């Protein structure tokens, strides 16, 4: 492990006092932590921070992720996930998703198990979950998120999707899985939408099953996870429900409900997919109720 990773591993330890951690940073002046303008924190699987690296009068900001925190991953499990980060990112890029560059990733041992340290390109914007919740967010910005997702999911790389049956219905199977939720998306100032979460790479085999699946990371069964993360209809429905949930005021729900219906109706989605998604939207997302039961989306 190089010096920079050794430093970061030390800073992650819970048995070192904050004063000692500050001394570690002072003794390593080439790595500077700053309080970022964007709010970062802990997700279900990862801790995320912004780093400012200063070397030879140049400054570069990167995202530092600690993936698999508190998941008690074995070394082999962490290594399998780590080695799939770059290939998975390339699969997404090939299919039209904007994804940040990964500079470096490494498996690191901690007291609670093995985690993956990942250093990635910083996209200067907040995630779309926070954006949706902000009262000051422009109306068109929220609508742009859904419209851009559908634009990507209907591009030429998605023209001939394989049909698979789940829950007694035929769905359009994506050639990859993707955890499409608002917290994993960033809309930048130029209007480009970026998918920024590669951990737990959701790659599929040619037969349409998961290349890597780990119950430590995913609470859903493999089939249910396929429905909401690897079918076009399931991905869109999940996004619609999350978008309606994260509006800042309840009285905005009906306005966005109708706008979302218009976006689906006028989208290039196949007609049978449109009708199914609209029916699910009107009926309160029965598919998602079946998938998640009592769990949260």
Question: What label would you give each PLM region?
Answer:
Residues 222-297:
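Helical subdomain adjoining the active site within ATP-dependent kinase catalytic cores
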Residues 67-79, 130-137, 171, 207-211:
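Short, flexible/disordered intra-domain loops and linkers
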């Amino acid at each position: 492990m190089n010096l920079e990773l050794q430093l970061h591993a030390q800073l992650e330890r819970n048995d070192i006092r904050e004063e000692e951690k500050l001394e570690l940073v002072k003794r390593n002046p080439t790595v500077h932590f700053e309080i970022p303008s964007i709010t970062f924190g802990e997700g279900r699987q990862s801790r995320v921070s912004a780093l400012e690296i200063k070397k030879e009068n140049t400054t570069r900001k990167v995202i530092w992720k600690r993936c698999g925190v508190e998941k008690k991953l074995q070394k082999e499990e962490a290594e399998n996930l780590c080695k799939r980060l770059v290939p998975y990112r390339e699969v997404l890029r090939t299919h039209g998703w904007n994804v940040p560059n990964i500079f470096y990733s490494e498996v690191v041992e901690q007291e609670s198990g093995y985690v993956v340290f990942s250093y990635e390109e910083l996209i200067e914007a907040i995630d779309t979950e926070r954006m949706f919740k902000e009262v000051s967010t422009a109306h068109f910005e929220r609508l742009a998120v859904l419209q851009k997702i559908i634009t990507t999911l209907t591009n030429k790389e998605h023209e001939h999707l394989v049909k698979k049956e789940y829950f007694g219905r035929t769905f359009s199977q994506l050639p990859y899985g993707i955890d499409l939720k608002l917290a994993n998306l960033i809309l930048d100032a130029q209007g480009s939408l970026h998918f920024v979460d590669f951990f737990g790479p959701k790659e599929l085999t040619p037969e349409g099953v998961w290349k890597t699946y780990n119950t430590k990371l995913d609470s859903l069964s493999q089939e249910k996870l396929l429905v909401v993360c690897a079918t076009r209809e399931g991905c869109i429905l999940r996004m619609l429900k999350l978008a309606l949930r994260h509006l800042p005021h309840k009285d905005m729900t009906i306005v966005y409900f109708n706008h979302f219906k218009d976006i689906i109706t006028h989208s290039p989605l196949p007609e049978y997919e449109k009708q199914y998604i609209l029916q699910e939207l009107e009926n309160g997302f029965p598919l998602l109720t079946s998938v998640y039961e009592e769990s949260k989306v």
